[in-house]
């Protein structure tokens, strides 16, 4: 009996190691061929104890159901990844909205270094190189017929960074928002200069300023980012006081390098 246990365990867990598909809403699925280019975007997930790189992948073709997925598998080597995209996954339940077939591929918590990527679909492969440093992820890839990277470089959020926005409904509230930003510095927040680029959660333009979201929904908005190493509860308390005093007039968001 002992001779059969390990092979049986291997057979059970092998699909879990290498096969992945979309988060579909039903187990009743059909599959169809991938017939358009796959666009790939780098994204880093932040948490208090680690940082995880993901690839967000979507077909160039737009479908009538937003919940179509992409079936794929990944084989990871010491410094390499082979990613094979198999097919578009069609659920029997359609969430009616236009969108690409998509999937999210977990690359993991990667050490600094260089990684070779092999991207395969419909029997053809394209090669790319991923360079990981403490400051960024960079992709070296010549766009081909089957794959395209939307962001060839993803800057990494520095330690102790906080950032966000203050949206407000009337220009007369500008002084209140400025007071909030000044109060952050009284609490210990220090101005920080970041190089231009895409940080995933925000972008910095060539002048070093934080770019407001394209569709932020406020008549007026101010962006901010600081180095902050003191008690985060003090910032939460400051935000709460202002938003309680100016209900439905000022909306403040705040995010941290630990994913809060």
Each predicted region: which residue ranges?
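Acidic/polar, low-complexity intrinsically disordered N-terminal segments immediately downstream
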Residues: 22-86, 141-165
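A short tyrosine-centered beta-strand micro-motif
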Residues: 110-122
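Short acidic/polar inter-strand loop motif in beta-rich domains
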Residues: 89-94, 120-129
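Short, cysteine-centered beta-strand-loop-beta hairpins and adjacent loop/turn segments enriched
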Residues: 63-65, 89-99
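Ligand-binding face of N-terminal immunoglobulin V-set domains in extracellular IgSF glycoproteins
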Residues: 98-112
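A eukaryote-biased signal for long
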Residues: 173-260
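Bacterial Sec-dependent N-terminal signal peptides
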Residues: 1-6, 11-39, 260
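Surface-exposed beta-loop interaction hotspot
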Residues: 125-184
């Amino acid at each position: 009996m002992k001779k059969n246990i390990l092979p049986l365990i291997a057979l059970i867990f092998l699909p879990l190691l290498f096969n992945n598909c979309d988060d579909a809403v039903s187990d009743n699925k059909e599959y169809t061929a991938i017939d358009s280019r796959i666009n790939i975007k780098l994204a880093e997930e932040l948490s208090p104890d680690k940082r995880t790189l993901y690839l967000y992948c979507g077909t160039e073709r737009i479908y009538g159901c937003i919940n179509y997925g992409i079936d794929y598998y990944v084989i990871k080597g010491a410094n390499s990844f082979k990613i094979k995209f198999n097919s578009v996954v069609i659920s029997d339940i359609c969430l009616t909205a236009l969108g690409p077939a998509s999937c999210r591929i977990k690359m993991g918590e990667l050490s600094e270094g260089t990684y070779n990527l092999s991207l395969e679909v419909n029997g053809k492969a394209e090669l790319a190189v991923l360079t990981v440093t403490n400051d960024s992820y960079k992709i070296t890839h010549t766009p081909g017929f089957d794959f395209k990277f939307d962001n060839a470089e993803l800057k990494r959020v520095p330690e102790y960074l906080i950032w966000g926005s203050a949206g407000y409904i009337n220009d007369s509230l500008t002084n209140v928002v400025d007071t909030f930003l000044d109060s952050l510095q009284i609490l210990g927040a220090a101005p920080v200069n970041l190089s231009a680029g895409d940080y995933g959660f925000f972008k910095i333009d060539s002048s070093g300023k934080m770019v407001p979201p394209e569709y932020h929904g406020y008549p007026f908005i101010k962006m901010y980012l600081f180095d902050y190493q003191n008690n985060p509860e003090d910032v939460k308390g400051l935000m709460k006081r202002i938003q309680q005093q100016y209900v439905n007039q000022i909306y403040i968001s705040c995010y941290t390098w630990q994913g809060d």
